[in-house]
């Protein structure tokens, strides 16, 4: 009997008087006890449930009453297996979750190993992560070397051409006496190493050819012009030379 004096749910369902010390009273209250005990009575019977609870210790009876009710509800839905089918389904879910957990652990371990030792997973790691400024410095140094070599070759070619021009003019330019007596009139032809020719005309009164100082000046101007980007070496720099 409950504390309010009304019968418990089991006794109410059985339509009997609930006596003091009823085995069902602590576990089947007045409000919902009747519907819960109806499932137990339908599956196991009231007498079997009473005997089961009576043979258990007091501290285990509440859990046993809940288990009996759950099994009675499962037997109503599946009379053959009852709650066993639910147990199998839950066990399968546990196995699947354990498998997924192992896979995640392995992936986490591999990720940690890859972070700790990147050179083992990727041998080209340090080569790929070479500082960009080192590569740029190497390219710039190579560019300077190439430019310097080209400039050196161009200067060497220019010196050779100018030296050849100097000796060629010294050899192939010969004065001749004109019709004016002491007055020396000369027409000179200069053949450059490139095959082009220019006529050098001059008039002098004493027959002395002053080509050296002016030729040196022209050669110096030609060399400076070539270093500053000039392309015409002979035609623009060597003009008409006068002698006295």
Curated annotation (Swiss-Prot):
One of its GO terms (biological process) is callus formation. Residues 6-108 form the LOB domain. Expressed in roots, stems, leaves and flowers. Pfam families: LOB. Induction: By auxin. PROSITE patterns: LOB. PANTHER family: LOB DOMAIN CONTAINING PROTEIN (PTHR31529), LOB DOMAIN-CONTAINING PROTEIN 17 (PTHR31529:SF65). Belongs to the LOB domain-containing protein family. This is LOB domain-containing protein 17.
């Amino acid at each position: 009997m409950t504390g309010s004096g009304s019968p418990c749910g089991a006794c109410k369902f059985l339509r009997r008087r609930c006596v003091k010390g009823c085995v069902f009273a602590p576990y089947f209250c007045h409000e919902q006890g009747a519907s819960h005990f109806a499932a137990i009575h339908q599956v196991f019977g009231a007498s079997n449930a009473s005997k089961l609870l009576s043979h258990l210790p007091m501290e285990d009876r509440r859990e046993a009453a809940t288990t009996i009710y759950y099994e009675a509800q499962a037997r109503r839905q599946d009379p053959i297996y009852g709650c066993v089918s639910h147990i199998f389904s839950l066990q399968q879910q546990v196995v699947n979750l354990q498998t997924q957990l192992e896979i995640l652990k392995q992936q986490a371990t591999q990720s940690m190993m890859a972070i700790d030792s990147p050179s083992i997973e990727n041998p080209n790691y340090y080569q790929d992560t070479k500082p960009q400024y080192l590569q740029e410095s190497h390219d710039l140094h190579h560019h300077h070397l190439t430019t310097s070599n080209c400039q050196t070759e161009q200067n060497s070619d220019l010196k050779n051409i100018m030296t050849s021009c100097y000796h060629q003019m010294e050899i192939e330019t010969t004065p001749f006496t004109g019709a004016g007596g002491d007055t020396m009139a000369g027409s000179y032809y200069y053949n450059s190493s490139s095959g082009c020719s220019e006529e050098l005309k001059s008039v002098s009164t004493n027959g002395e050819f002053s080509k050296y100082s002016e030729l040196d000046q022209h050669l110096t101007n030609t060399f400076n012009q070539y270093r500053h980007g000039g392309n015409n070496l002979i035609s623009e720099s060597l003009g008409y030379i006068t002698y006295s």
